[in-house]
C-alpha cells in the first residue's frame, strides 16, 4: 500500500530539486509529465528508444506484448541527466498490457535512485493501474529509492490537472 512521503532536501529551507523522466508513445504520458513540469518547474527528460515502435496502434501492441512476454529489452537512447542533482524524480509511463513500458523499465534499471524520493505515475486508455506500481516497486526498491504514492491517469491530463496537483501536494512536491 502506498503512503504519502514528503520530499526532503539537503537544506531544510530549500525547495526540492525535481526531475521528470517519461516515456510516451501516443502523447498521453507526455501530457502528464509536462503538467508536472509546468506546476513545479522540474527539469524534464524523455526516454526514447533506439529503434522506434511501429506508428500504428495495433502493430505496436503486438510488438509490446511480445517484449513483455519474452522480457525483450528494447535499447534506449542515452539521456543527459545527473540524478545526483535531484531530490525528487518523477517517473511517468504508459500502461502497456497492464505493465510499465519496457523502455522506461530499461532506463530505470540502469539508474541509482538511492536516497531519492521517486514518484511514479501511469497513463492508460481504460485499463487502470494494473501492474505498473508493482513493476516500479520491483525496479526501485533494490536501489534504495523512497517511493511516494502512485498516480494513475486515464488518457491525457487536460481534464485531470487537479488530480496531478493533489498528487504532488500529497507527496510534498509543491507548486513552483
Question: What are the residue ranges of the model-derived segments?
Answer:
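Short, conserved loop/helix-junction motifs that constitute active-site signature segments
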Residues: 84, 109-115, 127, 141-142
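N-terminal beta1-alpha1-beta2 submodule of the flavodoxin-like/Rossmannoid cofactor-binding fold
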Residues: 2-91, 98-100, 105, 163-176
Amino acid at each position: 500500500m502506498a503512503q504519502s512521503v514528503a520530499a526532503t532536501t539537503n537544506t531544510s529551507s530549500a525547495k526540492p530539486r525535481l526531475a521528470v523522466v517519461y516515456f510516451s508513445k501516443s502523447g498521453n504520458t507526455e501530457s502528464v509529465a509536462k503538467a508536472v513540469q509546468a506546476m513545479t518547474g522540474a527539469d524534464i527528460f524523455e526516454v526514447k528508444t533506439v529503434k522506434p515502435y511501429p506508428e500504428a496502434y495495433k502493430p505496436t501492441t503486438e510488438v509490446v506484448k511480445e517484449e513483455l512476454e519474452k522480457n525483450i529489452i528494447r535499447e534506449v537512447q542515452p539521456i543527459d541527466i545527473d540524478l545526483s542533482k535531484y531530490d525528487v524524480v518523477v517517473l511517468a509511463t504508459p500502461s502497456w498490457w497492464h505493465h510499465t513500458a519496457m523502455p522506461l523499465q530499461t532506463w530505470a534499471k540502469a539508474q541509482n535512485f538511492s536516497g531519492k524520493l521517486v514518484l511514479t505515475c501511469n497513463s492508460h486508455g481504460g485499463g487502470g493501474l494494473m501492474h505498473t506500481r508493482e513493476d516500479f516497486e520491483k525496479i526501485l526498491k533494490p536501489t534504495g529509492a523512497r517511493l511516494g504514492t502512485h498516480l494513475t491517469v486515464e488518457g491525457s491530463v487536460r481534464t485531470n490537472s487537479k488530480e496531478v496537483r493533489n498528487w504532488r501536494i500529497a507527496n510534498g512536491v509543491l507548486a513552483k
